[in-house]
Structure formats: C-alpha cells, structure tokens
Design a protein with these regions (language model features):
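Hydrophobic/aromatic packing residues within the alpha-helices of TPR/SEL1-like helical repeat arrays
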Residues: 199, 233, 273, 307, ...
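A contiguous, surface-exposed recognition patch within enzymatic or periplasmic domains that forms
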Residues: 1-47, 55
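TPR alpha-solenoid repeat register
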Residues: 212, 246, 252, 286, ...
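Residue-level recognition of tetratricopeptide repeat
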Residues: 183-184, 209, 218, 243, 249, 258, 283, 292, ...
Length: 837
C-alpha cells in the first residue's frame, strides 16, 4: 500500500484523488522484484510466469500475516485479533500463541471475505505465533512475527546528484562500480543520468573492462551509432578472445551481429550471429534474426529449422513460433501452419503477429473460423492500432515478407477499430507502408501514401524505432520537399543523439513549411541544449509563437477547441519565459512579453511562472494575486514549484513590510507563507523547505521582544535533516540553520557549523566534474549549463555565508557573481535589491 505523502501534501492528494476526500492509497504489486526501485532482468523473447492472488481483507484491516489461505491481524491498538479467509473454510483450528502459551484459540468456519474477531491482551513488544490447521490436519498458516524486519530499516536512497551520495561517476572507485551504477540508472530510467556516462568513466579507469565495452556497444546499437558500436566490440573482442575464441557469454557476438544488421551488412550479420549461438545465453535472440534472414533468402527449410532452434530455448517464443508456422505454410503444409497459428492465438490473445498471420492465411485459403477474420484482427487492437501494426509489419519485413507487411498496414486504411481510435492509420504508418511498397516496386502506391503522410505533421506518437530512421530517410529521398518527413526525421535523429543533423532537418522543415510552428520550437531546443547557441533560442521561440498565433488560434472555434489551441500557446510561452529567464533577459521586458502573449486560460505551470516573473521585478502583491485567483491541481512533483512561488513571494513581502517597521503585518506574511491556500490543492514534499520562512518568523518575533516564541519557532530548523527530498532546498538552507542555532544561544557551534559549510561550498564551486542541472518535469527539453548552475548555487550559499559573518560587501559581490552564472536565482536578486535599498 502506498500513500502519496504526509501532512498538507498528503491531505491535498487525498482530496485530489478521491471522490469523497477520504484516504487515498495506491496498490502496488509486482513480480520478480522486492521493492519499487529493485529490478530484475528479462532477456529478449524470454517468458516469465507469475501469479498474483487478490482477496478482500477489509474486515481484518491491516494484517500481520497473509497467504493464500487467509489473513490475520494483530491489532495492538484495539487489543483485537481478526481472521479472514479467501475460500470457504470449515472446522479449521486457529491459534495465536506467545512462547508456547496459547492466548487465542478457536475452531473457525468462514466463507470468503467473512471474518471473526477476538478480544486479546496483546503486548506491543512481543512476537506472536499464528497457526491455522485444517480439519484434516493440513497446516494452512504457521508464522511467527519477526521484529528484526522492523529494526533493519534501509538507509535513505540519496539522490545521485548530491555530492554526498557517493554515486557520481568519478566518485566511484572502480570500473566495476561505475558499470553497476550505470546499469542501475538505465534500469531506473533516471531522467538526468544515462548509463553511457558511467560506462565511459568505467573505461577511463580500465580501458579493457569488458562489461562496459559491451554496454557501450549495446548503447550504440540502440542509438543507431553502428560504426562506433563496432569499435567498442573490437576492443572487447581483443580482450575477451585473447586466449579463447569462444567466450562463455555470447553477447559480444550477438551485439556485433545487431550492429552489422543495422549497417545492412546482412551476410556478415548472419555469420556473426551464428558465432553468437555457440554461447547458450543468446541462442534465442540470435536464432530469431538468423531465421528472419533465412526468410529474406526464401530458404524456408532453414527458417523453420532455426525458428525451432530458438523455440527449444523459449517454447512460447513471441516471434519464432509464428516464423515457424509461416515457414511451414511456405513449404506447403497449410493445415499444419494454420493449426500452429491457432494454437499460438489460443494461448495468447495479444500475440498480434500470430493473429495477423492467421487472418491473412485463413482468408487466403478460404477457411476463416469465428474470430479469425481481418475485421476481428483490427477490432481487437485496443492500444494504438498504428503502433501495433507497424510492429507487426517490421517483424514481417525482417523476414522478407513484404506482401504481408504491406497488407497489415493497408488494412488500417479501412479498418473499423476500437472506438477510442478515430484515425487508425497514423502518419508513420503511411510512411512505413510507402517505404515497403517502394522497395517492392509499387511506386504509385508508395507516392500516394507519402502524400497522405505529408499532410499530417501532428502525430500522437513520435518515431522511435531504429527502422523508422530508414523509413523517413526514404521519404525525404523520394520527396525532398516533404516538410513532414524532414520534421519527423529530425525528431528521431535528435532522440538518437544526432543533434546537428536533427537541427538541419528541422531547419529544412521550417523552410518548406514556415507556417508549421513545431520545427521552429524544436530548433530552439537544439540551439539551447546541444548546439552552443543559447541566445539564439529566444528568437527561434518567438518565431514559433508568432507562427502559432497566426495559424493555430481560431477565435471562432468552439470552447473545447479554443482550450486545446490555448494549451499549445501556453507551452510555447512557458518555454520562452524559461529561456529568457535563464539567459538573463530584462525582467520587465520578459514579464511584458509573457503577459502580451499568454492565453486567456492559463495552465497551473504558466500561472506560477508568471507569479515568479512578478516576484522577479519585486511586485509581490501581483505575484500573490496570480496564485490566489487560479484553481490548481498540481501534477506529481510539480507542487514544489507552486509552493515555492507562494512562500517566496510572501516572505519577500514580509521582509519589505518589516523594513517599514510593520512587524505585525510582516509576521502575518511569514506565518501565512507556511500554510497552503485551499485553491492550491497541494503541499510541501518536505516541510523543511520552509527553512527561510521559519527563520524570518523567528527573527521577527525576536524583534518584537517575544523571545520564547522566537526560540520555539527556531527549534523547527534545528536539527536539520538533509533528506534530499525537495529540489528547492539549495545549499543556503544551512545558513538559516546556523542563524537558528545562534538564536538558540549556541554561538560557538553555529560559527563552526557555518565555517564547515563554507569550506564544503568552496570545494563544490571548484568542482566541474559530474554536474547535472536540477531535474524538472517542465523544461527538461532545455538543458542548461550544469557546471554554471552548480557554481551559481554554491556561490549564492557562499554569499549567505558572508552575510552570517557580517560581510555585506563580500556577500553582494558573490550574489552578483552568482547571477552572472545563472540569472535565474530570485533569492540572490532579492538580497541585492534589499542591499541597494
């Protein structure tokens, strides 16, 4: 059971996620995994089997033990024992004992979901034994509570990007550690780190470390860097095959085969994959591609033989069972092929490759049974039909079955699919079909589908498959004036790390279709994040907004359509605001531009961005009004930005009031800044993020002569737990902790604490290695200079350190230095504003 959060945030999410504002809990279940961040592996075409059993336990409430035979609760708070069962149980003996002494005993007869409750004196510190034995003597439960499980609590899993985590690539001591950490971030889909960054450091430490070499080769395959991948394989092969040409682990030759396949070196790939099959661990995936190449050569006997070889490793193989049946059909065993396909479909109704092959061949032979028609095939595609059919088509094209591959995509044009999919045939489905038809010599059909695709640049799924690079290159080659093909090719090339080539594609798309706003926006992303032209991103985004407002905003449209149009504009304005902010644009100019171009109905994100823009020019009442007049339902993890915008604006207002001698009004601001308004429907992920609001409240109380109240408030910051739970708790939080320590009378230790922090911050400022910007779900397309951002954050902290020791001049100098590195620091800007006043 998973609850979203505690305190205000927990209450907010309970309200957001329930109809009656009751308690919300999320059921979390898995197999082959012990916890959410714990993973296992599934190999290509491997099938894992698992079972899950669910039954109601509401009667017993929180169980101390549960299995397939029942659940038992030991409710120490209410001094109750409860038992329930998932199936009818008659005359079973139920006992709860402590040290051999039975404290509860009964013969129970229960129906499913019924429960019995017993009074019992339960000791909070004791470990009880639970037993349930059927009337025929079978032991259904036998469990003794293990208190050690509660004692052995794991340590916090500190965020990678924190220096103290010890998980950064150059912090790890060995190539092995870097390889394992890289493997973990890949499994965890970490948004800021990629496995390749760790593998490269592993190879700095040990250039012959084979696991990292193979991992880099795999990464190169996944990003279509085939030639580079072969270089890593050559290095690994030189080490691994120094004395033995046949290593135990066949992945080195399997990935070599894939890389050769990616380069369209079919013969070399075939030979290399055979070499890979000498090792047991890659027989199934290697034989799959071997069987496909056999199909390309129309060697159906070999295709059948090699598909069967793969099936000996994985009897429920997702591809080779169908390849085997297709080979039988091609060899003339029609009845055997159809029988195999029917068996596959009966065992797995979601095997769409087999379902299509069955519909295709049954229709060709005139032996279609119930549920086997083409209409049945398309009618059961409940997820995106085009994506499923592209997958099927590419599996068929691998084996040279162009007629079937074309047929599965052609059927999308007229298919009646599940009602949620209004346009079953997507842009990429048209381009893929055009590519298949073109290779088959049907230029007329290919041209027709490319023409249709070119008219639909807005897609629901971006191209991501390696094969789609070739599909789009084919489209661009066939029609160099196809802006949609250039645009989509740029998208997939950017995803595969070909940044400069992607930008050229988007540039061409913008030239060919200047009224299509997305290429302009994508060029801004590339220039800002990858091409070293951050300043150029602003003009590109302004162009995107100009184009969008001209071509995508129709004031005569219906309300629902207008909202959709506004959502697109909202994103562009939000992104431009971010870029201008990061690049140090004049605050008033930025705010005026955003206010001129913002849509009538704002998203949550743009609302708090505008509030921050008002705070940036010190108009805190307007910032607070923006936040007050909007109804928020913040997305997960974005609450932090909303609450920070609110707390910061109120604290700044309070500090200005305090300068005017209005202490009561200032105190009210500081206190309100720590309580979320109802319209926010949010809270703090970590209430320690209120560290500065807490200090200003305490300091104001002290200024008012209310010393005891002030110290009680200051105690909320001491001790301070560095949990890394909130991205807004920058290093300067320790400055406020030290201030609170000093207020509480511990002057010596506060100075030691501050001195220790300053020394750490100075080291961080000097460190340019392994830096990443703070991850945000809002602007991750725009990747700022992580080294500058880190230096800026720690320089701000050093400025506060100067303030602690009374050096205002030194603090001002450091604040200015920090803003030159990263102009997007409202705290530094406001401190300078106060100093100047």
């Amino acid at each position: 059971m998973f609850q979203w959060a505690l305190e205000d945030l927990g209450d907010a999410w309970n309200a957001n996620l329930t109809d009656i504002d009751g308690e919300h809990a999320e059921l979390m279940a898995g197999s082959f995994s012990n916890d959410q961040p714990d993973f296992t592996y599934i190999q290509p075409y491997e099938v894992k089997y698992f079972s899950q059993y669910w039954y109601p336990i509401h009667g017993v409430k929180v169980p101390a033990f549960a299995n397939l035979h029942g659940a038992v609760a030991l409710d120490r708070e209410l001094q109750k024992i409860r038992i329930t069962v998932p199936e009818e149980t008659e005359g079973a003996r139920f006992e709860v004992s402590l040290g051999g002494k039975v404290i509860c005993s009964d013969t129970v007869t229960l129906k499913p979901s019924e429960y019995k409750e017993y009074d019992a004196a339960l000791d909070s510190d004791a470990s009880y034994t639970i037993r349930l034995v059927s009337k025929d003597g079978a032991v259904l439960m036998d469990y003794t509570e293990d208190r050690e499980q509660e004692i052995r609590m794991p340590e916090d899993n500190i965020d990678i990007n924190e220096t103290r985590s010890g998980k950064l690539p150059h912090q790890l001591k060995t190539a092995q550690e870097d390889y394992l950490m890289g493997n973990h971030v890949e499994q965890y889909r970490d948004p800021s780190w990629k496995g390749r960054e760790y593998y490269r450091v592993a190879l700095e430490k040990d250039p012959e470390y084979v696991p990292a070499l193979i991992a880099m080769a795999e990464d190169c395959y996944n990003t279509a860097h085939y030639e580079e991948g072969l270089k890593y394989i050559a290095r690994a092969e030189k080490v691994l095959c120094r004395w033995n040409q046949n290593p135990e682990d066949g992945r080195i030759f399997y990935f070599k085969g894939l890389l050769l396949w990616g380069l369209h070196r079919e013969y070399d790939a075939y030979e290399t994959l055979f070499k890979a099959t000498w090792s047991d661990n890659v027989i199934s995936p290697a034989m799959t591609l071997i069987a496909a190449i056999d199909g390309r050569r129309h060697d159906w006997r070999k295709m059948k033989e090699h598909a069967a070889y793969a099936m000996r490793k994985e009897k429920e193989h997702a591809i080779c069972r169908t390849y085997h049946a297709i080979a039988d059909y091609k060899l003339g065993d029609v009845g055997g092929a159809l029988a195999q396909l029917r068996e596959i479909v009966a065992s797995d109704r979601l095997d769409h490759l087999a379902r299509f092959a069955l519909a295709y061949y049954a229709q060709a032979e005139g032996v279609v049974k119930k549920g086997e028609s083409m209409a049945d095939f398309y009618g059961m595609l409940y997820s995106n039909p085009s994506q499923t059919c592209i997958d099927v088509a590419l599996n068929l094209m691998d084996a040279g079955l162009a007629d079937m591959a074309a047929a599965v995509l052609q059927g999308l044009e007229t298919a009646e699919v599940w009602h949620d999919w209004n346009l079953p045939m997507s842009t990429m489905a048209h381009y893929t079909l055009a590519c298949i038809c073109g290779k088959a010599g049907d230029g007329e059909t290919a041209a027709r589908h490319r023409a249709v695709a070119s008219e639909h640049p807005y897609v629901d799924t971006f191209p991501y498959r390696l094969e789609e690079i070739d599909v789009l290159r084919d489209a661009v080659s066939a029609n160099p004036k196809d802006a949609t093909a250039h645009y989509l090719l740029g998208n997939i090339l950017y995803d595969k790390l070909f940044y400069a080539e992607a930008a050229e594609c988007w540039k061409k798309a913008a030239e060919l279709a200047p009224d299509f706003y997305i290429p302009w926006r994508n060029l801004a992303v590339a220039h800002y994040s990858k091409l070293g032209d951050r300043a150029g991103a602003e003009s590109l985004l302004k162009k995107a907004i100009e184009v969008y407002e001209k071509n995508n905003m129709d004031p005569k449209a219906g309300a629902a359509q207008v909202r959709k149009q506004e959502a697109g504009l909202d994103v562009l304005v939000k992104e431009l605001n971010y870029v201008m902010c990061k690049e140090g644009a004049d605050g008033r100019e930025r705010l005026d531009y955003v206010l001129r171009h913002k849509p009538a109905h704002l998203t949550d994100n743009l609302t708090w961005d505008i509030a921050d823009a008002y705070s940036n020019v010190f108009e805190f009442d307007k910032a607070l009004a923006m936040l007050r007049d909007h109804e928020f339902v913040a997305a997960e993890c974005q609450e932090t930005y909303l609450t920070e915008a609110y707390t910061f604006a109120l604290c700044c207002k309070g500090r200005l009031l305090r300068r005017e001698g209005k202490l009561e009004e200032a105190l009210d601001c500081f206190r309100r800044s720590q309580h979320i308004p109802a319209n926010f429907r949010a809270g703090w992920w970590d209430t320690q993020a209120l560290y500065y609001a807490v200090w200003f409240e305490a300091e104001t109380l002290m200024m008012m002569g209310r010393e005891e109240e002030a110290k009680a408030v200051a105690h909320r910051n001491v001790p301070f737990i560095h949990s890394g739970y909130s991205p807004y708790m920058g290093p300067e939080c320790d400055y406020y902790v030290a201030l609170c320590m000093r207020m509480l009378g511990d002057s010596v230790n506060s100075r030691k604490y501050m001195t220790h922090c300053i020394m750490q911050w100075e080291n961080e400022v000097a460190n340019d290695v392994d830096r990443k910007p703070i991850v945000t779900s809002l602007y991750w397309s725009y990747v700022p200079d992580a080294v500058k951002e880190s230096k800026a954050a720690y320089t701000v902290a050093l400025a506060y350190g100067r303030m602690f020791f009374g050096d205002s001049e030194g603090a001002a100098k450091l604040f200015r230095e920090a803003l030159s590195l990263n102009p997007d620091n409202l705290k530094a800007k406001f401190e300078l504003y106060l100093m100047q006043k």
